[in-house]
Amino acid sequence: MAEGEDVLPLPTSSGDGWEKDLEEALEAGGCDLETLRNIIQGRPLPADLRAKVWKIALNVAGKGDSLASWDGILDLPEQNTIHKDCLQFIDQLSVPEEKAAELLLDIESVITFYCKSRNIKYSTSLSWIHLLKPLVHLQLPRSDLYNCFYAIMNKYIPRDCSQKGRPFHLFRLLIQYHEPELCSYLDTKKITPDSYALNWLGSLFACYCSIEVTQAIWDGYLQQADPFFIYFLMLIILVNAKEVILTQESDSKEEVIQFLENTPSSLNIEDIEDLFSLAQYYCSKTPASFRKDNHHLFGSTLLGIKDDDADLSQALCLAISVSEILQANQLQGEGVRFFVVDCRPAEQYNAGHLSTAFHLDSDLMLQNPSEFAQSVKSLLEAQKQSIESGSIAGGEHLCFMGSGREEEDMYMNMVLAHFLQKNKEYVSIASGGFMALQQHLADINVDGPENGYGHWIASTSGSRSSINSVDGESPNGSSDRGMKSLVNKMTVALKTKSVNVWEKVISFIENTSTPVDRHVSSSDRVGKPYRGVKPVFSIGDEEEYDTDEIDSSSMSDDDRKEVVNIQTWINKPDVKHHFPCKEVKESGHMFPSHLLVTATHMYCLREIVSRKGLAYIQSRQALNSVVKITSKKKHPELITFKYGNSSASGIEILAIERYLIPNAGDATKAIKQQIMKVLDALES
């Protein structure tokens, strides 16, 4: 749980002594939320005191009439829609006729003024009518109705609460973190959270729950005063439906969405205590970075969302700040603790690493799959032992750390994909990698034993001063000095009771071989890792999932891609060469494929695993557009093709494709020979 949060238990209590205390506190005036919490202690609120408690919780008690300066003219272009929706709402309330007209005007005025003051275009899909329902039941005067509505919109309804909006991509990452199996199932059916939870979040459940249940949820939620807590309430509702969803695999996508969307409607008053208790448990098992890195979703901050941070739809998993990683493992007792897995090459790890980090060289995944499998097994055993022994390195939560350089972290992405495919819970990535860790330690000026951070970086090689040369220059002089002072304080890697365990598995994990040449460079990449990555991963066990459902590039193009019979294409008279292979995406995904070479073109046919013998035509490239074919000594089977245009001013790269090809030497030789024939023909 994030630092400084209050856990509100929801006890039940007989007797009304606390209710009298609450009433007296409210009557006395000047009562704050903390005082109310101490009195209420999460118990169900008396109906006659709810309005006063909510106004204090929303910080609008005693606030003036925001509508006083408004002319009251209802003249928005969408006014007819607003009026119609308000009228339908009034009809559902069964309000006495003499009060209906006044209430109708109040609600329509609140919505109209909010639209005008915030420059928002109204639509029925916004769920505002549902959001107003619990407030209307409090029988508030118009000024209080508006102030409460405004406060809820401002503090508790996230920005971009719409189809494909950022709040729902964040919710998917939370589901994946805690319930990877459920997340994977929904992903394979292409069911995104916005398809079923849009109105959960947009109405804070008021759209589906009875007024009594909604009031009970809001009683606890508003006292919690944590806008992110709604995510955990939504998660529990989803988890509660998990068993039903997973046992009804034959249901269509639409049936599953409809079932999920209506799940909150089955909640009863008796369920609310358990709902909050479970939500608080999941909340306590969630890294603080979930909130801190997304705080701008809520509130009136004017700070924009940086482009690099904005695209949560393409995130592989939750990202954890390096400051949280350092702080979390210093905590005693309960709380999120991380088992850090350093996926950098051996020479970088040996030059300097987080002292509590476990080394898993991601190169092994391609270089030596059997050793990689053994390394993973050893890693999980070491994690278990470190937790049992109370080691400072121990933690339930796996956090993978790369270098922080995108082209190198492609390998780490493949390792991450492996763990996510296995439905491993509590999987995250260290934001910014080891470079961010270096920078953070330099920024907090690790200088002197009193700060407690001097032991965090360790070296297992002789060249301690090589950290900066391995992981990039510091952007400024002070950072560089900070790192040098830090390097001078390096100590042994692990101060732990489980040293023997680490020694037993070190032969599998600590690859101290000669430096490996990287075959990827910054000029090689198209797009970025963590981008265009769909959430179901297919590495090694391709038969588990239909690859057309997971590849990022096929998500929008499936309907347009041509489906062909693989054998028919291989047997075509114009096909000169056929190479079975695996297409390797920037994210680390690999897909069973076939490269076919004709006199003038190279085709990639990607197998459709659920339809044996068939494939998509994934790419079609003219041989004369190949400007470069590369491989590296340590990964000779991983071939990179670069396509583009050559001119006097240089080479313009238009596309890059990578393939894992058995007997790659024969394949590249044949392709190069065919390219030369094409070029010779063009010249002549």
Swiss-Prot record:
Directly interacts with GOLGA1 and GOLGA4. Interacts with FAM91A1, C17ORF75 and WDR11; the interaction recruits TBC1D23 to AP-1-derived vesicles. Directly interacts with WASHC1 and WASHC2A/FAM21A. Interacts with FKBP15. It comes from Pongo abelii. This is TBC1 domain family member 23. It is found in: Golgi apparatus, trans-Golgi network; Cytoplasmic vesicle. Pfam families: RabGAP-TBC, Rhodanese, TBC1D23_C. Residues 459-482 are annotated as: Disordered. Residues 44-225 form the Rab-GAP TBC domain. It comes from the Eukaryota.
